[in-house]
Structures are given as structure tokens and as C-alpha cells.
Amino acid sequence: MAAVIKTEFWRDIKPIADVFKPDAKPEAYIADAPTDDERYYVPFTETVSSRPLWISPSENRWCDVLMAKGAGLVNRHYHPHEVFAYTISGKWGYLEHDWVATAGDFVYETPGEGHTLVAYEHPDPMRVFFIVKGPLIWLDDNGASNGHFDVHDYLAMCRAHYDKVGLGRAAIDALIR
């Protein structure tokens, strides 16, 4: 375990002068990412919303905070690529697994997994930080594919919502890297 240092010993270290390479975009810094301000959450299903944090069209990838204020459901879907999840608050899981995630839990979803995401009733809203590489393949009740959702669908959905609530699509475009 690292030693506990009680002073900010690094205060005299000078920052790097040229932080970004000429073709690099700046970092995406978002204060209070799991905010309570519901305008930032894009309805994903009737019971679950997504707060976009970072979007990469060239990689078909996005990061978001998925939120449900009560019992919630994300339609059955399949991931051809890995997904990472860190639980901020609340309680959630997949009908197909016997674990239930709560605050502080981490989940790595392997490529090739199909599941049904549910948010359980809990005093705190379900908020989960996800790193998703698309597409999501929508599944019917028997597990057969019946549609897809990729980063371009995500961008269109987010832009439309941000325009509707007065935040503007420029706020979404600023997240593109």
C-alpha cells in the first residue's frame, strides 16, 4: 500500500507547457457527471435515461451515465463488443445473471453477451457509468435480433433531446472526440 502523505508535496512541480499535440482535441471535463438535473438525461427507454459524457463516432463508442429513478428496463440486447460498467448508486442487474450491482460495483461484459438490463426499486436512483462500444443489437423475447442501435443513433437521439430541452446540440457535439 502506498504511504499516506499529508502535504501536497507536488506544489512546486511546473505543469507541462505543451499539453496537446497539434492534432489533439482537449479533454472532455464534465463536473458533476451524475447530476440530478434531468435535462441532461436523454430518454433511452420509457423508464431509463442516458447522460452522454463522451462520444466517438469513428470508434462507434460512447460513455454515459445510465439512470433510472425507479424500476427500469432497457430492452433485451446483444453486445458484439465489450462493455464496462461502474455503479454510482442504486441497484441494477441482468435478468440472465444471478448478481445484482449496487454502489461501488464494477461489471465487465464480455463480447458476445445478450441480456436484459433491469433497474430494481431502491431508495437511490440507479446511476451507472458505462463505456459502450456499439452497436447494440436489439433482441426479441426469444433472443433473435430485430434491430440495432449504434453511435450514430445515439448522437441523433442526444442532439434531438438537448435541442428540445434548450441545452442545444452544440453541447452534444462538444463531447465528440
Enumerate the language-model features and the residues they cover:
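A short, N-terminal "cap"/entry segment at the start of jelly-roll beta-barrel domains
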Residues: 1-60, 146-148, 156, 160-177
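Conserved hydrophobic/aromatic beta-strand scaffold that supports enzyme active sites
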Residues: 50-52, 63-65, 84, 106-108, ...
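Short acidic-glycine-tyrosine-enriched beta hairpin
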Residues: 57-59, 93-119
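Small beta-barrel nucleic-acid-binding modules, principally OB-folds
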Residues: 60-69, 74-76
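Glycine- and acidic-residue-biased ligand/ion/polar-headgroup-sensing regions
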Residues: 69-71, 79-96, 102
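Histidine-centered active-site/metal-ligand motif
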Residues: 77-79, 115
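A short hydrophobic beta-strand segment most commonly corresponding to one strand
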Residues: 85, 107-109, 123-141
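C-terminal and inter-domain tail/linker signature
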Residues: 109-110, 153-155
